[in-house]
């Protein structure tokens, strides 16, 4: 119940990811862990990601400038909790991938819990969902000398659809491991991949997915 928010809160269900990671840390024994959104397709092994987990917490860094609407709102939330030094410019991390060693994730989730409690004490439930909490915790983690790294070598967020014409090569040239397909891509491309698997029992070849 640590991250319980009103049902009508924007991105209310996304807060469940914080609860899920906290539960896994408390109830499962493991060396390293990675939490992924469900609207993803993993196309390569995660061997290199596991190597980095021992050295840092890994999060997907969203390529947003400090003034981008969502990024600025996340920073304003932090300003409300820590007015000294405001205005802050937090790095915008997404919640589609959170990975690290058990020790590093335990420390990081403690920061998440404390930061969310401070937000709630100020009467703030971020409309930006779990991402606001990851970002605040990551900022504090870096200030404390506990590294947080961009996981963009392993995952990328591909917004596709009528409003997005996206050109990229990182799915096949020095390819990322995980394709994150939110929004329209979840309703079309990801569904086509799944339907192919359901019919044949194997995923389509990568050249067809691309």
Segments predicted by a language model, with ranges:
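A structural signal for short coil/turn segments at secondary-structure junctions
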Residues: 28-29, 53, 141
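Short aromatic/hydrophobic "clamp" motif used to bind/position activated sugar donors
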Residues: 33
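Long, low-complexity C-terminal extensions of enzymes
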Residues: 166-210
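Conserved donor-nucleotide/metal-binding helix-loop-beta segment in metal-dependent transferases, i.e.
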Residues: 40-81
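Catalytic metal- and UDP-sugar-binding loop of GT-A-like glycosyltransferases, i.e.
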Residues: 36
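Active-site-proximal specificity loops/subdomain of glycosyltransferases
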Residues: 1-30
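Small-molecule pocket liners
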Residues: 17, 56, 95-96
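Catalytic core and acceptor-binding pocket of nucleotide-sugar-dependent glycosyltransferases
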Residues: 88-184
């Amino acid at each position: 119940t640590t991250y319980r928010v009103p049902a009508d809160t924007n991105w209310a269900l996304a807060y469940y990811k914080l609860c899920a990671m906290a539960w896994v840390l408390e109830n499962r024994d493991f060396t390293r862990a990675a939490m992924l959104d469900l609207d993803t397709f993993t196309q390569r092994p995660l061997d290199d990601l596991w190597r980095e987990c021992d050295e840092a917490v890994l999060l997907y860094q969203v390529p947003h400038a400090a003034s981008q609407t969502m990024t600025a709102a996340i920073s304003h939330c932090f300003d409300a909790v820590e007015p000294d030094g405001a205005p802050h410019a937090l790095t915008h991390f997404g919640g589609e991938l959170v990975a690290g060693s058990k020790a590093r994730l335990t420390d990081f989730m403690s920061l998440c819990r404390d930061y969310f409690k401070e937000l709630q004490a100020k009467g703030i439930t971020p409309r930006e969902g779990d991402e606001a909490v990851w970002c605040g915790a990551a900022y504090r983690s870096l200030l404390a000398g506990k590294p947080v790294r961009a996981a963009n070598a392993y995952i990328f967020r591909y917004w596709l659809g009528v409003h997005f014409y996206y050109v990229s090569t990182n799915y096949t040239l020095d390819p990322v491991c995980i394709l994150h397909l939110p929004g329209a891509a979840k309703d079309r491309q990801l569904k086509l991949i799944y339907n192919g698997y359901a019919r044949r029992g194997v995923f389509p070849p990568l050249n067809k997915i691309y």
